[in-house]
């Protein structure tokens, strides 16, 4: 199974596919599937990618500098007209099943200094939705911990 993941990752890299595309596309063939309770195929894809390509994903010049994307999150909140617009969009993303995108929007609100009770509640909802759909030990432990932190 891991040979398949390895070979598909390297094949995708050679075809010029980006990391996130490969993380979303690569799956274990049904005859090798034993569940992902302890690890995740997407995590293995990332590890294989970074083993060969390193930390630089070749997607943005900003990867080469010490300034994280969160440094401009307050600017994004301001440009969006405030946290409420981003919270509404995060709610729409959650309702549409785009939980990971909802988390990105909530991170912008919270990292941009506009975090409030509503953003924390929404983040709890997203984490709970993600928790409900996983049977992975490490991911469920992380999500439960984050829910506890968000609620405190």
Which residues fall in each region the model found?
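Accessory terminal helices/loops
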Residues: 1-152
């Amino acid at each position: 199974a891991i040979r398949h993941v390895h070979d598909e990752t390297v094949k995708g890299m050679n075809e010029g596919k980006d990391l996130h595309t490969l993380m979303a596309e690569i799956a274990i063939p049904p005859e090798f599937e034993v569940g992902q309770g302890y690890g995740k195929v997407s995590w293995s894809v990332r590890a294989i990618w970074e083993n060969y390509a390193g930390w630089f994903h070749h997607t943005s010049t900003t990867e080469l500098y010490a300034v994280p994307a969160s440094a401009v999150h307050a600017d994004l909140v301001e440009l969006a007209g405030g946290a409420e617009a981003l919270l509404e969009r995060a709610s729409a993303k959650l309702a549409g099943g785009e939980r990971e995108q909802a988390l990105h929007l909530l991170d912008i609100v919270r990292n941009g200094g506009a975090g409030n009770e509503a953003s924390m509640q929404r983040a709890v909802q997203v984490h709970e939705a993600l928790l409900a759909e996983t049977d992975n030990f490490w991911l469920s432990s992380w999500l439960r911990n984050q829910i506890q932190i968000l609620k405190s």
